[in-house]
């Protein structure tokens, strides 16, 4: 059975926090693909980027995504870049899962992300990098999503409750 809900969105949108709250409300299991990768690799995502490179990480991300879509039936949170490849987009669409785009503005993301070293794609000028990522990713997120939730002014519990309403 495929995931009931797949959460997608940029860094700082609250995919992990909202996902945990949503899973509680739905009495479902929660899986975060970044956490699965970090556990499998015994390294943080930023360490994987530094030690093994982005290409390795993206390959691992696809592997974990394809596996979790096949074995997980609860709430699945994807890393911000996970839906970018054609393979990932196809798998997400074919899963039959409800996809929710958790959106956030730059102003909303900044205090959550902190634009620190733990976000490997946001090094250098993190605000400009984040905006550039969103310019590329937003059309993909929007094309995959059945629902869109702006999380700027919502707590994780409020965003999760809004998703439950959308699912009804």
Model segments located where?
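ATP-dependent small-molecule kinase phosphotransfer cores
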Residues: 32-93, 119, 127, 131
């Amino acid at each position: 059975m495929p995931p009931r809900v797949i959460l997608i969105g940029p860094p700082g949108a609250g995919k992990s926090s909202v996902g945990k709250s949503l899973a509680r409300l739905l009495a479902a299991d929660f899986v975060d693909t970044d956490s699965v990768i970090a556990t499998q690799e015994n390294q943080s995502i930023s360490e994987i980027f530094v030690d093994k490179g982005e290409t390795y990480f993206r390959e691992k991300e696809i592997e974990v995504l394809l596996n979790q879509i096949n074995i997980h039936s609860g709430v699945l949170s994807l890393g911000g870049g996970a839906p970018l490849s054609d393979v990932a987009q196809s798998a997400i669409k074919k899963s039959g899962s409800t996809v929710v785009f958790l959106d956030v503005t730059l102003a909303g993301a900044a205090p959550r992300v902190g634009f620190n070293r733990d976000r490997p794609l946001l090094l250098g000028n993190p605000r400009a990098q984040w905006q550039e990522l969103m310019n590329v990713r937003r059309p993909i997120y929007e094309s995959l999503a059945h629902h869109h939730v702006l999380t700027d002014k919502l707590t994780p519990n409020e965003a999760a409750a809004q998703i439950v309403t959308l699912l009804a």
